[in-house]
Amino acid sequence: MTTRSSKKAYANVGTSTNYSAQTANKSNKSKKQTNVVTNNNVQVNKKAWRHFKRSGNEVSFNVARSRIVRERHDRNWWHRHYSRITFYGGGYWYWNAGWWYPAWGYNPYYNNYIYNGPIFGYGYASPFDVTAQVQRALAQQGYYYGPIDGVLGPGTRSAIQRYQIDHGLAVTAAIDEQTLYRLGLA
């Protein structure tokens, strides 16, 4: 006659807790970025920032980036296709689906674009105003040390990238809807 022990098996809860604590900030290696620290302590509620769609913002940053018109056109073409065009940072920008894009060729004398990607917009704020507000918010939180000049230059993009990494956002180094929401600007 064999007797079996009727001891209850308990999971080792301490081990799983220690394991997740050890791996929470583990470094990931990638071909493009040599050392990116993943911050698993921050949770982003995607439903919380989808309210931008109500204000005319219809697409994500990746879709906006793919919609940039890369051909040069004269100002008549730009005005026939887009109703809102503004001068910003040495060049002209057009508004489309909640994003500001560089309008190459609008005026050949003003085609100096420091940044050539989309800038998320809200309401009727110009790209200059949006960028200046982001610079001001990043400076208040210790991420940006340059002048509040409304230019999305390398210093501003670097500060945005550090902020996005520290807050668990998608790292785009650009002004996008999630970053504006987390900064409390929209």
Regions from the PLM with identified roles:
Residues M1-A97:
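Intrinsically disordered, low-complexity segments enriched in Gly/Tyr/His/Pro and basic residues
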Residues A64-P147:
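Long, low-complexity, proline- and polar/charged-enriched segments
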Residues P127-T172, L183:
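A short amphipathic alpha-helical interaction element
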Residues A173-T179:
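Short glycine/proline-centered loop/turn elements that form peptide/ligand docking sites
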